Amino acid sequence: MQTIRTCLLIIGILSSVGTASFAQRVIEVDVCVYGGTSAGVIAAYTAEKLGKSAILIEQGKRLGGLTSGGLGYTDIGNKYAISGISRDFYRRVGKHYGKFEQWIFEPKVAEGIFLDYVKRGGFEVLFDSRLRQVRKQGQEITEIVLENSTDPSGETTIIKAKMFIDCG
């Protein structure tokens, strides 16, 4: 009898640990973009401009990836090959420096422009968030679970989306 009680107690403890009741925030959007790189910011911005709700997930504290991380020299060769939102970015850089376009820039200028895309797009950015779990139905991702990059034992966030884009 004592053995049965002990087993039931252990099962109860293990089952409560396995389904620990972490505080969870649930967010539902049309498009979830994972990675706050240049591509990630522009993907979320474009989704919003096309009438879709979007959220951007960034593991760190800064947007823009290499573009805002110190790689501020564009060596495309033929600047006429650049179009669309990329051209818009370089023209915004140019405006900062009092020029029409600018292909060499400081990291803080690039980051400021990416933050402006976020503001103009009106989408949320979750900083310090990393992937904990992916949930699928068949081959399709239906939601992801995020944890705080600096405090993994804290609150988790569930993102439910119709589309997931990896820009990490």
PLM-predicted stretches and their roles:
Residues 135-158:
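Conserved beta-strand-loop-beta-strand element in the redox core of flavoprotein oxidoreductases
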Residues 7-17:
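Bacterial N-terminal signal peptides
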Residues 25-37:
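Beta1/beta-strand and adjacent pyrophosphate-binding region of the FAD-binding site
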Residues 46, 52-53, 58-140:
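Conserved N-terminal/central alpha/beta ligand/cofactor-binding core
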Residues 54, 61-65, 158-168:
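Hydrophobic or amphipathic alpha-helical targeting/insertion segments
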Residues 20-23:
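Boundary at the C-terminal end of the N-terminal hydrophobic targeting segment
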Residues 27-29, 152-163:
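Core beta-strand elements of the Rossmann-like FAD/NAD(P) dinucleotide-binding domain
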Residues 40:
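N-terminal Rossmann-fold NAD(P) dinucleotide-binding loop
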